[in-house]
């Protein structure tokens, strides 16, 4: 799929059909590999020149917003597809591939009545896209919250012994619990194990001799048990910390372990459900935003053509997709098809300043022109 298109508008002197034929002929002759399509814009409500000029101040900003939301949803789709391991699907608008929707654009009269003022159409587009963006933020935040909880659990299960969950490393038989005795779990730096074995019995009184047993070792630490009298447990923790050993809090509970397993399974299920629903929502919403964007491009082309070529509306709007190597050639063809007087006028410094911030790259050409990137 081509990812870069030009939307251009050429001034019509005789008839749009004759200009269209000349454009096709010139493209076929000098740049045959450049696809060219009519961009069918209906007769929109012009309003006053003042209203057009006021609208022009907002066109570029509104375009950036709508395009930005479109790209944001596309990036979210790509991330979700990558995480899910699903094959990327071609994005569509009402079942039509996005490039085909652009090149065969048809104005949606039911959604955007052509008799509505242009400002009202633009505000309507921006309002609809803003609602979708707000919905996206809420849905992504909900998904990321579940994902964050799972990541935190995974870090605890796969992190170092200083932070990870110990429940799956400690068996019931490793723990001695009675009225007077308690078993503590000490996290010992990997290269300090000899020091631990040499001193743990003397860190405080009433430590059971030879009670320390290694349960697990990772790249940084080793996990040891030690059994002692309950009444000296706090003193042992303090003495161990002073020696560089960490005594982890731990409570052996089969019920608690089962509860954690159930919570983890539910989080995994919730994440998969949210990911699937978010991906489907993104597919649908991308189509809605892309459709809104193309209608906005039609309004923008119409408004800028009136401001460039005057009233009544007399212009030919089309979509081209030249290869990079053919761009200069196609620009030259488009320029030759413009009226020479208009070419000089719209290339003047006065025009460049007046149209700056309005027509994107159009101030450098004697015709309306801006680029649409689909990737």
From Swiss-Prot:
Record GO biological process: unidimensional cell growth
Gene field: VHA-C
UniProt-listed InterPro entries: ATPase_V1-cplx_csu, Vac_ATP_synth_c_sf
Lineage: superkingdom: Eukaryota
Family: Belongs to the V-ATPase C subunit family.
UniProt modification remark: Phosphorylated on Ser/Thr residues by WNK8.
Coiled coil: none
CDD domains: V-ATPase_C (cd14785)
Pfam families: V-ATPase_C
Biological classification of the source: Eukaryota, Viridiplantae, Streptophyta, Embryophyta, Tracheophyta
Localization per record: Vacuole membrane
Full protein name: V-type proton ATPase subunit C
Transmembrane region(s): none
GO cellular component: chloroplast; extracellular region; Golgi apparatus; plant-type vacuole; plasma membrane; vacuolar membrane; vacuolar proton-transporting V-type ATPase, V1 domain; vacuole
Recorded topology in the membrane: Peripheral membrane protein
Gene3D superfamilies assigned: 3.30.70.100, subunit c (vma5p) of the yeast v-atpase, domain 2, Vacuolar atp synthase subunit c, domain 1
Assembly information from the UniProt record: V-ATPase is a heteromultimeric enzyme composed of a peripheral catalytic V1 complex (components A to H) attached to an integral membrane V0 proton pore complex (components: a, c, c'', d and e).
Function: Subunit of the peripheral V1 complex of vacuolar ATPase. Subunit C is necessary for the assembly of the catalytic sector of the enzyme and is likely to have a specific function in its catalytic activity. V-ATPase is responsible for acidifying a variety of intracellular compartments in eukaryotic cells.
UniProt keywords, alphabetically: Hydrogen ion transport, Ion transport, Membrane, Phosphoprotein, Transport, Vacuole
GO function terms (MF aspect): proton-transporting ATPase activity, rotational mechanism
Organism: Arabidopsis thaliana (Mouse-ear cress)
